[in-house]
From Swiss-Prot:
Protein name: Fas apoptotic inhibitory molecule 1
GO biological process: apoptotic process; negative regulation of extrinsic apoptotic signaling pathway via death domain receptors
Main location: cytoplasm
UniProt subcellular location: Cytoplasm
InterPro entries attached to this UniProt entry: FAIM1, FAIM1_dom_sf
Gene name per UniProt: FAIM
One GO cellular component term noted in the UniProt record for this chain: cytoplasm
Homology family: Belongs to the FAIM1 family.
Length: 201
């Protein structure tokens, strides 16, 4: 089938709502963990057609056709907080290209390293459903499955507790001093009086 052919790919009624041409120029896929969830970024780069397409969580956010300059960058937003993301397209040799993702002006690796210092993440299973809880240490915002939670803070003898609910479940994040300068404050998620282990993203 020629690439410009508009004829259907399948003869029966079971054909998918997209053609096989969709995503044929897919060159890079990244997963980015933000407070509101893990986002999938896909990038198509047609080196012969000059096409550039960016998808975030399966939705097209940028489409450019007939770009004569094959190197450059595409900038867009990801997630509820509209986090700035940039895909850099660089020539490495001949017709080979390198694709790198920056989040808030940092390489993805550097961003994730910084993020692990500024957030805590827990994953738990309640009432037959999976939940991802994220604490942003700088703002003390709590996110659960992509939604910013309403919280109530309270001082206790050995630190603070930030209370919120997941469904009918009482939850709080307890913050206590580690007593060690390098470790700083230790945050623990307690759900129904049970501590949930933290995960590293």
């Amino acid at each position: 089938m020629a690439s410009g052919d508009d004829s259907p790919i399948f003869e029966d009624d079971e054909s998918p709502p997209y053609s096989l041409e969709k995503m044929t120029d897919l060159v890079a896929v990244w997963e980015v963990a933000l407070s509101d969830g893990v986002h999938k970024i896909e990038f198509e780069h047609g080196t012969t057609s000059g096409k550039r397409v960016v998808y975030v969580d399966g939705k097209e956010v940028i489409r450019k056709e007939w770009m004569f300059k094959l190197v450059g960058k595409e900038t867009f937003c990801v997630g509820a907080a509209k986090t700035k993301a940039t895909i850099n397209i660089d020539a490495v040799s001949g017709f080979a290209y390198e694709y790198t993702l920056e989040i808030n002006g940092k390489s993805l690796k550097k961003y994730m390293e910084n993020r692990s210092k500024t957030t805590n993440t827990w994953v738990l299973h309640l009432d037959s459903e999976d939940f991802r809880v994220v604490l942003e240490k700088d703002t003390l915002d709590v996110w659960c499955n992509g939604k910013k939670m309403e919280t109530a803070g309270e001082f206790v003898d050995d630190g603070t507790e930030t209370h919120f609910n997941i469904g009918n479940h009482d939850c709080y994040i307890k913050a206590v001093s580690s007593g060690k300068r390098k470790e700083g404050i230790i945050h623990s998620l307690i759900v129904d009086n049970r501590e949930i282990p933290e995960i590293v993203e």
